[in-house]
Regions:
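Conserved ABC ATPase "signature" region
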Residues: 20-38, 147-148
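Conserved ABC ATPase signature
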Residues: 43-47, 51
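Hydrophobic anchor residue at the start of the ABC signature
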Residues: 57, 85
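A short, proline-enriched helix->beta-strand linker immediately N-terminal to the Walker B motif
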Residues: 62-66
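A short, surface-exposed alpha-helical micro-motif characterized by mixed small hydrophobic
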Residues: 110-112
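ABC ATPase "signature
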Residues: 125-129
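Short catalytic/signature loops enriched in Gly
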Residues: 130-169
Length: 169
C-alpha cells in the first residue's frame, strides 16, 4: 500500500517513536504533494501516472533530504501532467529549500525548472552555466546543436530557423 511505500525510509531508519507518529509524517507528505490521507490505504495500480509521481516525490521527501536526483522523472508523462509535476517540484523547493539534480532531455522543461545547467555529451560534462548563460550564449558546439534543435512555436520563425550541426567524430 502507499502508506508502506512512502514510509519505507522511516521504517529502515526507525525514524519514529510510534506508529501514529509514522503515519502522521506520511499523511503530511501526501498532503504536501497534493494527495489526501485517504490515498494512503490504496495500492499503486489504482493511481494515474501523475499521482504515482507524486507518491514517488513523497517517498523521496519523507527523510528530509537536501538533494533529490530526478532522472527523467517526467519523461513518461503527458505534457499537462509534466507541467503539474514540475510546478509541484518548484513549489516544494520554495517551501523546503530542497535542491534537485534534474536529469532530462526536454530542454524546455530543463530551462523552466533549472537555475544552473550542466550539459553532458558521451558521458562527459562539456558545459556548465546558469540557465540564461547556457540558453543565451552556448559555448560548446554540442550545446549549440542541442539548442538549435528546439522547435520554435511561431511557424514563421520555425520555417527559417537554422539548426547547428555538430559532428562529434
Amino acid at each position: 500500500k502507499v502508506i508502506d511505500i512512502i514510509g519505507q525510509g522511516l521504517d529502515i531508519h526507525k525514524s519514529y517513536s510510534s506508529i501514529e507518529e509514522r503515519n502522521e509524517k506520511i499523511y503530511e507528505m501526501l498532503e504536501l504533494v497534493g494527495l489526501s490521507r485517504e490515498h494512503a490505504s490504496r495500492y499503486p495500480h489504482q493511481f494515474s501516472g501523475g499521482q504515482r509521481q507524486r507518491i514517488g516525490i513523497a517517498r523521496a521527501l519523507i527523510m528530509n533530504p537536501d538533494l533529490i536526483i530526478a532522472d527523467e522523472a517526467i519523461s513518461a508523462l503527458d505534457v499537462s501532467i509534466q507541467a503539474q509535476v514540475v510546478n509541484l517540484m518548484k513549489k516544494i523547493q520554495k517551501e523546503t529549500g530542497i535542491a534537485y539534480l534534474f536529469i532530462a532531455h526536454d530542454l524546455s522543461m530543463v530551462k523552466y525548472i533549472s537555475d544552473k545547467i550542466g550539459v553532458l555529451h558521451l558521458g562527459h560534462l562539456v558545459e556548465t552555466g546558469t540557465t540564461e548563460e547556457i540558453f543565451d550564449n552556448p559555448i560548446h558546439p554540442y550545446t549549440k546543436s542541442l539548442l538549435s534543435a528546439i522547435p520554435h512555436p511561431n511557424p514563421r520563425v520555425e520555417k527559417v530557423r537554422k539548426s547547428f550541426t555538430y559532428d562529434y567524430k
